[in-house]
Amino acid sequence: KSFLSDLIHKEVSTKSGETELLVFDDFCTLYQAGFWNFFNDLPLQQKSLTVRVGLDLDRLDDDCRLFEHVYATLNRLLDINFIFYDIKDIERSNLLIMKDSFVIQYALSKTGSFMMCSHISNGATVRDIYENFNFSDLTKRPLTALSDSLGMDNTGYRTAFYANSRFFFHLTNGFDFLLPHDVFESIRELSSPEQQQSIQRLCVTWEEIVNNAEIEFIIPTSSLMRYLENGYIYLTDVEYSLTPEERKEHIQTVLSTMQENPHIIMGVLSTLGLGKSYKGENLSFYSNYKTGFMKKNKRYIHNQASPFYLITDRRLHTIVLNYFRSLKELPLYRQYKIDELLTIYERIKPLIERTLCIK
């Protein structure tokens, strides 16, 4: 283990620009072997690392809760770009190939731990193996895609995604829905002339479509508290921090919209008692029940890693959606009706208003 960890850190630290690692195995199998811990604290500030790896969809179909391993890793390693492939479409050859750096072939024990590995570092040999095993083959269809933007125009991904009437959102990067109209105006005033029309269009989408749709929200309590304290939202492609007064108005808008729209479900996932190892969530999930994407908290990306994972495979999207919906079965989950929220809000209003003023 220490050899693999040291090798990955050494090779990444000596590279500049873009680096690519091909992993010919199942992500969850390697998670259980502790492999993804080797990527902790990689020096990626001035460089980019893309990891291409397989996913055993049959295994995830049987137990969608295994996706927790994938989510926890993506949430922790925000500076790395992951692209997933159906394990059936790649050679499950226990190979690790870092472009222009090394080839490793390893063996796992019956208990799933690393037993041994062979190492090739000869430049010409590594290049030959990479050319023979790379993922450019058309039969290797990615299950996900990276994106730096969802598009703010009429023909962008965002427009198509929200042209639906039913949504599920697991929000970790502020609460970027049911926003007051004045917040859109503030964002528009701070935007470039090219963006202002797009912000106006986004406002119309939210107020006329999303606010009237059937929506299920799940929000971790740590993310909710962080939003109340700093007001940060990552709205499609725009970063913005609501003022304390705008946050107060936002709370009122959420409550009034829920009174008008009985099809909005609000659920909170308690993060109390999860231990010191819990560092919070910085990866949100958005679904319209047909397709979905995950969005990183841009504040915690330290390089040029893409902030969006688009889930392009319908089967994988169903698995991911089922995983996040399964969180409702946890004892830490609590769902609230509007009358309950109104009562709670009146009871803790002084605490909320003091929290809003924390700097």
What are these regions (language model features)?
Residues 318-359:
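Charge-biased C-terminal accessory regions appended to nucleic-acid-, cytoskeletal NTPase
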Residues 1-334:
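Hydrophobic protein-protein interaction segments
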